Curated annotation (Swiss-Prot):
Annotated localization: Secreted
Gene this chain is encoded by: PF4
GO terms of biological process kind: adenylate cyclase-activating G protein-coupled receptor signaling pathway; chemotaxis; positive regulation of transcription by RNA polymerase II; regulation of cell population proliferation
Family: Belongs to the intercrine alpha (chemokine CxC) family.
Chief location: secreted
Keywords: Chemotaxis, Cytokine, Heparin-binding, Secreted
Alphabetized GO MF terms: CXCR3 chemokine receptor binding; cytokine activity; heparin binding
Quaternary state and interactors: Homotetramer. Interacts with TNFAIP6 (via Link domain). Interacts with CCR1. Interacts with CXCR3.
Name of this chain's protein: Platelet factor 4
Modification after translation: Binds non-covalently to a proteoglycan molecule.
Record has Secreted as a keyword: yes
A GO cellular component annotation in the UniProt record: extracellular space
Function of the molecule: Chemokine released during platelet aggregation that plays a role in different biological processes including hematopoiesis, cell proliferation, differentiation, and activation. Acts via different functional receptors including CCR1, CXCR3A or CXCR3B. Upon interaction with CXCR3A receptor, induces activated T-lymphocytes migration mediated via downstream Ras/extracellular signal-regulated kinase (ERK) signaling. Neutralizes the anticoagulant effect of heparin by binding more strongly to heparin than to the chondroitin-4-sulfate chains of the carrier molecule.
Amino acid sequence: SDDPKESEGDLHCVCVKTTRLVRPGHITXL
């Protein structure tokens, strides 16, 4: 949607899943 908060939430989800695979000790997305 056009809601910035929704977009940030989606990106955070993807980032957390990705970083968990690459860096198990680092689960933020950023």
